[in-house]
């Protein structure tokens, strides 16, 4: 078998669309980023990477470059990735369709095998490869590596029958996270790329929602910032307007009236839990916008939805 090796991208061509910008303006843009570079220097930034940013080629390459830039200016990015569309595609090939309850994928034994293969293999390897091709040093991890994520079977409350629980298969609830694994990589200048798969003490694999893993990882690592990339501008009200700032009380109201539902339930719950645990800055942003990660971290531009604990 002949191994295929992708050619490293030409650094001179990383952002050809910027070629027309005057040098003075480029310098001004960099100068505006300086206060944020100072603010987050040496800090851990947890990034939930998902949605179109993972499937559109231009956005994928842009994300890899953005993560490397954050590392080069002294931040410690930690990437937790999803892969819902890729899992759905793989399930179709074996004649299965995805089913979700309260934003969580119902995961039988066959689906769990697909999830492990897709997330811990194909998707993770693609992210690691791109970051490394652009000059970064990324290392892929699952929950099994170094006992990173210990999990147990999730007991999902049945909202229609109080006191009852819904069995959604091999979906995990995080018991512990071993921060030493991630910190050891950070100390050696690596960028951790984490697949949201946990393992029990007896070796059973569990599918864990990536938003849940990102939020808990931010808490345990004492991250300065948690950024969740998604396929919408942020949290929207029922009229489709962007809510730029949400408190815990406002989030409870949006849960109660059904404004937040489906896949946004675990996302917002995890974001709020992270904010309550001491993560100073929690944002949900539109990953469909090029360089949205840099815009959120390195500029004053109001972007997405900020989640507050009070």
Curated annotation (Swiss-Prot):
Q: In which pathway does it act?
A: Amino-acid biosynthesis; L-arginine biosynthesis; N(2)-acetyl-L-ornithine from L-glutamate: step 2/4
Cytoplasm: is it a keyword of this entry? yes
Q: Which residues form a coiled coil?
A: none
Entry-linked CDD domains: AAK_NAGK-C
Q: Which UniProt keywords apply?
A: Amino-acid biosynthesis, Arginine biosynthesis, ATP-binding, Cytoplasm, Kinase, Nucleotide-binding, Transferase
The superkingdom of the source organism is: Bacteria
The record's listing under InterPro entries reads:
AceGlu_kinase-like_sf, AcgluKinase_fam, ArgB, Asp/Glu/Uridylate_kinase, NAGK-C
Please tell me where substrate binds in this chain: 83-84, 105, 207
EC number, UniProt record? 2.7.2.8
Provide the leader sequence positions.
Answer: none
Q: What class of enzyme is it?
A: transferase
Q: Where is the protein found, in the record's own terms?
A: Cytoplasm
Per the UniProt record, the site (Transition state stabilizer) maps to 48, 267
Single GO term (MF): acetylglutamate kinase activity
Q: Which reaction does it catalyse?
A: N-acetyl-L-glutamate + ATP = N-acetyl-L-glutamyl 5-phosphate + ADP
What are the BP-aspect GO terms? arginine biosynthetic process via ornithine; L-arginine biosynthetic process
Gene Ontology cellular component? cytoplasm
Similarity comment: family membership: Belongs to the acetylglutamate kinase family. ArgB subfamily.
What does the protein in this record do?
Catalyzes the ATP-dependent phosphorylation of N-acetyl-L-glutamate.
Q: What name does this protein carry? A: Acetylglutamate kinase
Q: Which organism is it from?
A: Ralstonia nicotianae (strain ATCC BAA-1114 / GMI1000) (Ralstonia solanacearum)
């Amino acid at each position: 078998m002949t191994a295929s090796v992708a050619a490293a991208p030409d650094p001179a061509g990383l952002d050809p669309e910027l070629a027309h910008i005057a040098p003075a303006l480029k310098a001004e843009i960099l100068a505006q980023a300086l206060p944020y570079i100072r603010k987050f220097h040496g800090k851990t930034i947890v990034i939930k990477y998902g949605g179109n940013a993972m499937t559109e080629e231009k956005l994928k390459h842009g994300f890899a470059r953005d993560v490397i830039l954050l590392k080069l200016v002294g931040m410690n990015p930690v990437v937790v990735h999803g892969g819902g569309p890729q899992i759905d595609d793989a399930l179709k090939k074996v004649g299965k369709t995805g089913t979700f309850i309260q934003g969580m994928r119902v995961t039988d034994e066959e689906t769990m095998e697909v999830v492990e293969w897709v997330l811990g293999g194909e998707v993770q390897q693609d992210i690691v490869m791109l970051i490394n091709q652009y000059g970064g040093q990324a290392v892929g991890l699952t929950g099994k590596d170094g006992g990173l994520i210990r999990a147990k079977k999730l007991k999902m409350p049945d909202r229609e029958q109080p006191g009852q629980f819904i069995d959604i298969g091999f979906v995990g609830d995080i018991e512990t996270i071993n921060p030493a694994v991630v910190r050891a990589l950070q100390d050696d200048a690596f960028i951790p790329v984490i697949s949201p798969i946990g393992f029990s003490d007896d070796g059973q694999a569990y599918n864990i929602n990536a938003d849940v893993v990102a939020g808990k990882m931010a808490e345990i690592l004492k991250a300065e910032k948690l950024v969740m990339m998604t396929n919408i501008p942020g949290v929207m009200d029922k009229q489709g307007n962007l809510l730029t700032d949400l408190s815990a009380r406002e989030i409870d109201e949006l849960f109660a009236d059904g404004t937040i539902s489906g896949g946004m339930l675990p996302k917002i719950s995890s974001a709020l839990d992270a904010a309550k645990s001491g993560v100073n800055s929690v944002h949900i942003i539109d990953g469909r916008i090029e360089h949205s990660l840099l815009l959120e971290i390195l500029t004053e531009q109001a972007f997405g939805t900020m989640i507050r604990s009070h």
